[in-house]
């Protein structure tokens, strides 16, 4: 089971070739993909997103947010920032969701490496 970050989803939806988009395609065919709620929010924020794509994205099972999630996400972000590493709020929410659910995160965004070092995020960083 995997979750994909927004960067991988956008590349996939635009038909961009890459290790990550191929892995996402295979995982979708095998029904081995779950959706991070923050990623879904980012994807649905695109005013140009076709309605049929929105409907398809909404059919992917979402990872459940667990109690005290917001506190853990805030502490995770603070931990990364204390090391003077980049930790965008959305990335912290995505990382914490995957950490809590023990789900591998597939991405092409190298900023997630900071969460691997700080919190043992299970990351599959693909070459675009």
Region annotations inferred by a language model:
Residues 50-54, 80-81, 122-125:
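Short, hinge-like loop/turn segments at secondary-structure boundaries
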């Amino acid at each position: 089971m995997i979750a994909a970050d927004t960067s991988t989803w956008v590349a996939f939806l635009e038909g961009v070739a890459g290790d990550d988009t191929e892995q996402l395609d295979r995982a979708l065919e095998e029904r081995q993909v779950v959706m991070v709620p923050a990623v879904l929010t980012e994807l649905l924020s695109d005013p140009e997103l076709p309605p049929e794509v929105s409907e398809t994205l909404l059919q992917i099972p979402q990872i459940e947010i667990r109690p005290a999630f917001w506190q853990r996400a805030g502490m995770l972000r603070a931990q990364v920032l204390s090391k003077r590493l980049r930790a965008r709020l959305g990335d912290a929410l995505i990382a914490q969701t995957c950490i809590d659910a023990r789900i591998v995160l597939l991405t092409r965004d190298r900023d997630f490496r900071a969460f691997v070092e700080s919190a043992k995020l299970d990351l599959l960083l693909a070459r675009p």
